[in-house]
Amino acid sequence: MADEVPTAVPLATPAGSSSLSFTQGFLLGQLSIAILIFCFIKFFIFGEPPSADDRALHLNSLRRARTLAHQQSYKQLRTRANSTSLSLRHKPSTSIIRKGEETRGGPSIATILAKTYYNVKGHQPESLDWFNVLIAQTIAQLRADARQDDAILTSLTEVLNTGSKPDWIGEIKVTEIALGDEFPIFSNCRVMPAEDGFWYGPGSTGNDKERLQARMDVDLSDVITIGVETTLNLNWPKPMSAVLPVALAVSIVRFSGTLAMSFIPSSSPPSTTAPMPSPTSNTHRSSSPSRPASSSGAPPHRPTTLAFTFLDDYRLDLSVRSLVGSRSRLQDVPKIAQLIESRVHAWFDERAVEPRFQQIVLPSLWPRKHNTRGGAPEDTEAAAEGEEGLDEDDFAVVDGNGTAPGSTSYIPSPIAENVTLEERIEAEGAKMREAEIRAGVRKPSASQERSRGRDDRADGMRWRGALPR
């Protein structure tokens, strides 16, 4: 009888082992996720931020690298512009003003420094104590005006809520404003030639003449605070699914840096020889509003401006307080402080840190009669009455027949519209002379005395101040 081959009997595995391995894997996965979340919260959100010195050093290195890159690109652009403009020659303009020694639009830097007895290399920096006093008075007045009412709170709230704002940010409300009590201190002022690329506006190739700049150190240690409240809205799966209240308070505790200022002179488009107008064109111009005579292709007029910027080695220390949540609140989250601080530095770098600069158009400093103050009250009233409406705008554009086109702020009297400018000036001069005679500053002429006497006899009254006849 043949031997029977034994068949392998499968080992019976307990059912609990498979469920145990699944449970172990599930718990291990949950534990790993919990560890990752814990590490993220501990080291990313609540991690200790770097010190203020380390942050300032890192930001200064980044800004310096950006400035050096801009200077290199500017030098290349200026080299190409000089090579292409060698063949261009400006035509000499005819002027009735006698030219001085410098025939290229003004004295050079060396001439200015020599005539003002200023040695750039040997002159000691100035303290600017007088300038600090003037700036402190101005800032104190601005703070006093802002504390009178809540207008600054209302205006800041409107500014923060207008414009493009993400839909996940609720209404922003300004809750706190502290304007500080200290004043900036300017010191160590020195004058030097302006560096290339810092003082040329858009569209300029840098062919302009060199300019001087004044550099001064600025230091402000104060607490200037703005506090806001808003909400973070979760709009998924439906709008306003969850709302997270957030309160922030950002304070500037210190600012130090170097301020550079320079004057940018005005530039006018080159004058072109205009053809003689025909009678028909004069008639058409008198019936239509005046337009600038320059063509559209001519460069625009650039007024005199004051440009200022801060060097890239400035330091801005901020203090950010945060409060997130309604019941279980998170207070002073370091990551929120870092994000806000980086945004503030980026906003300031894009506007007032080299190579970018701010320009302020300077007003006209020519003495004007209607800007005169002081003296006797009668003189002030007479000057105000005589100069009412006679502004620079009245003489800016004049038609060919001598009349000012359009409507101005000056309304002389309900007389004919074709009164010439000379007649208007003569009438205003008569008003001023009459006011001076009434105030006793000026004696009347013989013709005025005779006409005054006839008026007195006709009315049966004597002119006040005149001698009895």
Swiss-Prot record:
- For the SMP-LTD domain, which residue ranges apply? 124-363
Pfam families named among the record's database cross-references: MMM1 (PF10296)
Extract one GO BP annotation from the record. mitochondrial outer membrane translocase complex assembly
Q: Does the keyword Transport apply?
A: yes
Lumenal topology ranges: 1-25
Name the membrane topology term: Single-pass type I membrane protein
Query: Residue spans with biased composition (Basic and acidic residues)?
Result: 426-439, 449-462
Keyword Transport attributed: yes
- What GO CC annotations are associated with the protein? endoplasmic reticulum membrane; ERMES complex
What ranges does the record give for the region Disordered, renumbered to this chain? 266-304, 426-469
Primary localisation category: endoplasmic reticulum
Q: Give the top-rank taxon of the lineage listed in the UniProt record for this protein.
A: Eukaryota
A GO molecular function assigned to this protein is: lipid transfer activity
Which ranges sit in the Cytoplasmic compartment? Answer: 47-469
- Compositionally biased spans, kind Low complexity: 266-299
HAMAP family given in the database record: Mmm1 (MF_03103)
Q: What is known of its domains?
A: The SMP-LTD domain is a barrel-like domain that can bind various types of glycerophospholipids in its interior and mediate their transfer between two adjacent bilayers.
State what this protein does.
Answer: Component of the ERMES/MDM complex, which serves as a molecular tether to connect the endoplasmic reticulum (ER) and mitochondria. Components of this complex are involved in the control of mitochondrial shape and protein biogenesis, and function in nonvesicular lipid trafficking between the ER and mitochondria. The MDM12-mmm1 subcomplex functions in the major beta-barrel assembly pathway that is responsible for biogenesis of all outer membrane beta-barrel proteins, and acts in a late step after the SAM complex.
Which family is this sequence assigned to? Belongs to the MMM1 family.
Task: State the name under which the record lists this protein.
Answer: Maintenance of mitochondrial morphology protein 1
